[in-house]
Amino acid sequence: MFKHIMFPVDLHLPPEVRKAAEVAAQVARWQGARITIVSVTSNQPADLTQTESAIHDRLSDLADELSQASGAPVDFRNIHSVDVAAEVDGDLARTAEEIGADLIVIGTHAPRITDFILSSHAGYLAKHASMSVFVVR
């Protein structure tokens, strides 16, 4: 049913990401799917809190953990953005199409008052992505 799972992550690894990682691993194991981890980071010099090498290492470590948990091949991709807050939703939706994902597994927080005005990232993907989206709370 699912062959390629896209797993968007916040590199600060809040609890929602860890829980969603468990779900992505279980679905990949059950479906025999591969996983691509996707992160969006800023390319503005004032916003660079981590080096490219540190980002690569963090994604590589997460990919190794996810591969061990799922038994599936796991790749990763970091997208550079001028304005992460404004562009992350579109970047994730485009990347899902580009890599041929047929499922997005994404963690989210409990709804806040602002989510009724501006959708969460998971809410945006659930509404706009052309593939299935599994939102993990």
Task: State where each predicted segment sits.
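Short, flexible loop segments at boundaries between secondary-structure elements
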Residues: 131-137
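Structural beta-alpha unit
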Residues: 68-104, 111-112
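Small/aliphatic-rich secondary-structure junction motif
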Residues: 2-50, 68-74
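Charged helix-capping and loop-helix junction motifs
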Residues: 20-22, 53-56, 89-92, 118-122
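Glycine-rich, Arg-bearing micro-motifs that act as flexible, cationic patches
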Residues: 103-128
